[in-house]
From Swiss-Prot:
Organism this protein belongs to: Homo sapiens (Human)
Protein name: Olfactory receptor 2T10
Residues glycosylated per entry: 5
Taxonomy, superkingdom: Eukaryota
One cellular component (GO) term of this entry: plasma membrane
Membrane topology of this protein: Multi-pass membrane protein
Residue numbers on the Cytoplasmic membrane side: 50-57, 121-139, 220-236, 293-312
Localization of this protein: Cell membrane
Disulphide bond pairs: 97-189
Segments traversing the membrane: 26-49, 58-79, 101-120, 140-158, 196-219, 237-259, 273-292
Entry-linked InterPro entries: GPCR_Rhodpsn, GPCR_Rhodpsn_7TM, Olfact_rcpt
Biological process, per Gene Ontology: detection of chemical stimulus involved in sensory perception of smell
Gene name, Swiss-Prot/TrEMBL: OR2T10
Functional note: Odorant receptor.
């Protein structure tokens, strides 16, 4: 009997990625390990930045926000996915599905804007170092971070209620491991073309505008680095910027694939793999790419872990 015939109270069924794998138990253990690493590493980074006064700078303020987003990101999807697999129960309530969708859109929108704000921070630090403390004051950083969270919240509030209001009479089986908008829309038996146009326009704003800000910022950064006489200064600037560019490429590449490419280029399997990459792998990679190879962070970590030996 199909899962859709067992639906009670309008519940959905997350078919997930485990049905595609010959050894789901091993994949479940792997995902749980990744989840634990992502949670522990991001919490550690947040604590480091909070405790160590030398990390109280605009750059680490934004990294702190990024870690908070990544921590919430992976917590929205992975626990439910693992519980469903272990309990052999693929159901998710309509409320639970809508909650997943909202937080996913909110966090995704906030991260899009935050990565642009981080690029602007690097632009000011490298191109206008003498005015850095004024242009990137604590008040400015708070305004930028608050704006990122606000834009993400607006994105979630606009798209989620409309998506969940469509009638789902074809099936309640979601070909995904969480309630992502494109996967849920495929179940609707009504015309969703207008909503898809609206969502596409939102993606243009949330993806292409930040990408433009990042591209322009790095254009001027590269020009400034090229003019630097100090080899050490160039190396430090390139190291900082390369970390950010790596994070940007990983996140925006997967997001643009999922939300902006024509549906003819996409399949449920490819969509799940793309979403798996930037909802599960990215939160565990970001602390490594952006911070734990940074000398300031490693020094702060050693300082936090150091234990005073009692005198004998």
């Amino acid at each position: 009997m199909r899962l859709a015939n067992q639906t009670l109270g309008g519940d959905f069924f997350l078919l997930g990625i485990f049905s595609q794998i010959s050894h789901p138990g091993r994949l479940c253990l792997l995902i749980f390990s990744i989840f634990l690493m992502a949670v522990s590493w991001n919490i550690t980074l947040i604590l480091l930045i909070h405790i160590d006064s030398s990390l109280h700078t605009p750059m680490y303020f934004f990294i702190n926000q990024l870690s908070l987003i990544d921590l919430t990101y992976i917590s929205v999807t992975v626990p439910k996915m693992l519980v469903n697999q272990l309990a052999k129960d693929k159901t998710i309530s309509v409320l639970g599905c809508g909650t997943q969708m909202y937080f996913y859109l909110q966090l995704g929108g906030a991260e899009c804007c935050l990565l642009a704000a981080m690029a602007y921070d690097r632009y000011v630090a490298i191109c206008h170092p003498l005015r850095y403390s004024v242009l990137m004051s604590h008040r400015v950083c708070l305004l930028l971070a608050s704006g990122c969270w606000f834009v993400g919240s607006v994105d979630g509030f606009m798209l989620t209620p409309i998506a969940m209001s469509f009638p789902f009479c074809r099936s309640h089986e979601i070909q995904h491991f969480f309630c992502e908008v494109p996967a849920v829309l495929k179940l609707s038996c009504s015309d969703t073309s207008l909503y898809k146009i609206f969502m596409y326009l939102c993606c243009v704003i949330m993806l292409l505008i930040p990408v433009t800000v990042i591209s322009v910022s790095y254009y001027y950064i590269i020009l400034t680095i090229h003019k630097m006489n100090s080899v050490e200064g160039r190396k430090k600037a390139f190291t900082t910027c390369s970390s950010h560019i790596t994070v940007v490429s990983l996140f925006y590449g997967a997001a643009i694939y999922n939300y902006m490419l024509p549906s003819s280029y996409q399949t449920p399997e490819k969509d799940m793999m793309s979403s798996f990459f930037y909802t599960i792998l990215t939160p565990v990679l970001n602390p490594i790419i952006y911070s734990f190879r940074n000398k300031d962070v490693t020094r702060a970590l050693k300082k936090m872990l150091s234990v005073q030996k009692p005198p004998y």
